[in-house]
Structures are given as C-alpha cells and as structure tokens.
Regions:
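Loop-to-transmembrane helix entry/capping segments in MFS-fold secondary transporters
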Residues: 70-82, 193, 290-302
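Juxtamembrane intracellular "pre-TM" segments in multi-pass secondary transporters
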Residues: 128-164, 183-188, 219
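Symmetry-related core transmembrane helices of the 12-TM Major Facilitator Superfamily/SLC fold
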Residues: 108-126, 328-346
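Cytoplasmic helix-loop-helix junction between adjacent transmembrane helices
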Residues: 45-86
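Transmembrane alpha-helices of Major Facilitator/SLC transporters
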Residues: 196-223, 238, 242
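Short amphipathic helix-loop junctions that connect adjacent transmembrane helices
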Residues: 171-196
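C-terminal transmembrane helical hairpin of 12-TM major facilitator-type secondary transporters
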Residues: 228-279
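C-terminal ends and interior cores of transmembrane alpha-helices
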Residues: 8-35, 237-257
Length: 354
C-alpha cells in the first residue's frame, strides 16, 4: 500500500498500544483482577507495540532505498545514520521513561507519549510527500518471501545474530547485574534497577553512535559490496570469540563476583562495538540487495527474520539461564553467533560469482 500508509499505520498502532496500556488499571478492575486476562491484555498490547515499531522502522529504511543513490557510499552513510540515530533515541527513551515514571507516574507517562505521537502523526500527514513507492495491490502473500538468494542468506544470518545478542541480554545480564548490585532489600532493589536501566540505556546510545559512524570507520566510499560482506563475516566471528572468552571466564568461576562484574562490563562494551558495526553492515546490505520495486517486502521479510531471531534469543535466554546460569547463556550465544557466521559464506560466494 506504499510507505506512507505503513508509516502512518505504525504510528497509529503505537498510539493504540500505549492507550491500551494506559487503561490497564481500569480494565483490570472490570475483569475482577483475573490473572489470565490481565496477562493476555498486556501481552497483546506489547505485541501490537512491537508490530508498530517494525512497521515504522521498515517504512523509514525502505524510504532510504528510494531516496539515496547507491554510489560513493551514500546509501551506506544514510542507512547507517538512520539506524544509529534510531538506536540512540531508543537508549535515550529508557532514560526518559525512567524520568517520567519517577515524576508523573505510569499512567500519566503513557498518556504523555500518546499525545506526543498524535502530534507527530498529524504533522507527517500534512508534510509527507505522497507516493514514496508504487502500490502493488496484486501482490500475493507468498511474494512476501524473498526469491533473492542474497536476501535469504542475509536474513538467516540476521536471525542468528540477534538471537545471539538477546540470549544473554534478556535474562542473563539483568539478573547477573541485579545479583551483584543488590542485597535484596527494598532500597537496594530500587537502586539496582535504576543502575541497570541507566547502564543499558547508556550502552544502547553508544551502540547507536557506533552504528552511525560505521561508514566513516570503514571508509565505505571505497569499498565494494563483496568487501563489506567479508568485513561482516570477520566481525561476526570476532563476536563469537568475545562470547567464547566470556563463557570460559564465567564457567571457570575463578574470579570474585565483583571482578567478574567488571569483566562482563568490559566484554559488553567490546561486544557492543563489534555488534554495532555488524548490524550497520547488515542494514546497508539488505537495502543494497533489495529491488526498488519490492523494497518494502524485502525489508519486511528481513525484519521478520530479525523478530524471529529475537524471539528465539528470548526463549533460549530463559531456558539456558534456568539450566546453567550466565555461562549457559553465553555458551548458547556463542553457538548462535557461529551459525550466523556460517550463513555469511554462501552470501559471500554469491556476491563473488556475481
């Protein structure tokens, strides 16, 4: 239906999701506090919020394909800036959310965000140029799945790459940090939650900044697609090495809790730097390989793989932590990274032959 529609739909769904969460207490009262209904209500609202985010992200990145020329590294620079700034804003959002919760409370914070998004949506309706892409109303559902081998291999690599990140980020790292920073008392719990939230937001901001400057770090204007794929392959292998070292250090149990905490923090920053470069390269490659006529479907398929990877990582994060703690999470992340690395080989071979 075109990028304008998907962008508006993304913002609209986000407004609906936030409004639903803001009304949670009233809905909970009307359902007589039924736990199963309450859980389903929150899960559906959060799911709608996730769909909204991906629609908005897909629209923005697809528009870059249409607007930026793929010459002299221009496309790479534009998509890296968009991706990096998006994640920097996401990290800032953690801090803003914490501040809103502290000063005006949960419900008022959500209604404030709803009002802000309504203003943004109305502005976009009036200032957005129409027809960023052609509307292919005859497209079949099966056409969503890409027939481009480059995109299929890249999407597979993306699935395991983000699975490798979330398998230790979702459960392992927050619980490990909490166990080090809190003694279990109410005051220490609050302090620990704030410290962990601040650290993760700071990490995401730096992660986004690294993504934005990746073209400059790699001198992208002078590099071919094949060269960029080779760098991607080396970067994901380096990620696996970082994770393997962290796995060995945590499993050996030779360090004190405090010393291990600092090792993990250093490892997080090293992992984040390389992961940001790799993610930025992926974001460029998906647009470079997409056909202009079906860019929304190609990018949508790619982000479907991204979402599947995050689901896989979240599931494995809980399971692996349950059975083996942080070392098991890190070991699982290492394996997923290696899978991502292996899937880059066919992509490199295809590009070399082409």
């Amino acid at each position: 239906l075109g990028l304008n529609f998907t962008l508006y739909a993304g913002l609209g769904f986000q407004i609906i999701a936030l409004s639903a969460l803001a009304l949670y207490s009233e809905v909970l009262q009307s359902s007589a506090g039924l736990a199963s209904f309450s859980l389903a209500y929150v899960v559906i609202s959060q799911g709608l919020s996730g769909i909204a985010k991906d629609l908005t992200k897909m629209s923005a990145k697809s528009a870059v394909k249409w607007l930026a020329p793929d010459s002299d590294g221009t496309l790479f620079r534009w998509v890296a800036f968009l991706t990096g700034s998006k994640n920097a804003v996401k990290g800032s959002g953690f801090l803003l959310g914490a501040a809103l919760l502290t000063f005006i409370g949960f419900t008022s914070a959500l209604w404030s965000l709803v009002a802000l998004l309504l203003v943004v949506l109305l502005l976009l309706v009036f200032i957005m140029p129409s027809g960023l892409t052609t509307k292919n109303k005859s497209a079949k559902l099966k056409q969503v799945f890409s027939v481009n081998s480059h995109i299929n291999w890249l999407s597979g690599a993306r699935l395991f790459l983000f699975g490798a990140r979330d398998v230790w980020f979702v459960v392992g790292i927050p619980i490990f940090f909490y166990s080090i920073l809190s003694d279990g008392s109410l005051s220490q719990n609050r302090t620990a939650f704030f410290q962990i939230g601040f650290f993760m937001s700071f990490w995401i901001i730096l992660y986004g900044a690294t993504q934005a400057i990746t073209p400059k770090l790699l001198n992208s204007a002078s590099r071919s697609r094949y060269s960029i794929i080779r760098i991607t392959k080396m970067a994901v292998l380096f990620l696996a090495v970082i994770l393997a070292v962290l796995t060995a250090v945590t499993a050996a149990n030779l360090l004190s809790d405090r010393a291990l905490f600092y090792v993990i923090v250093i490892g997080l920053f090293g992992f984040g730097f390389v992961f940001a470069i790799n993610s930025s390269l992926h974001s460029y490659l998906i647009l470079a390989f997409s056909d202009a006529e079906r860019v929304t479907m190609d990018v949508g398929f790619y982000y479907m793989s991204n979402a599947a990877g995050r689901l896989l990582g979240t599931f494995l994060s809980g399971v692996s932590y349950q059975f083996g703690g942080l070392p098991a999470c890190l070991a699982c992340a290492t394996i997923l990274c290696l899978f991502s690395w292996l899937l880059i080989f066919p992509l490199a071979n295809l590009q070399k032959q082409g």
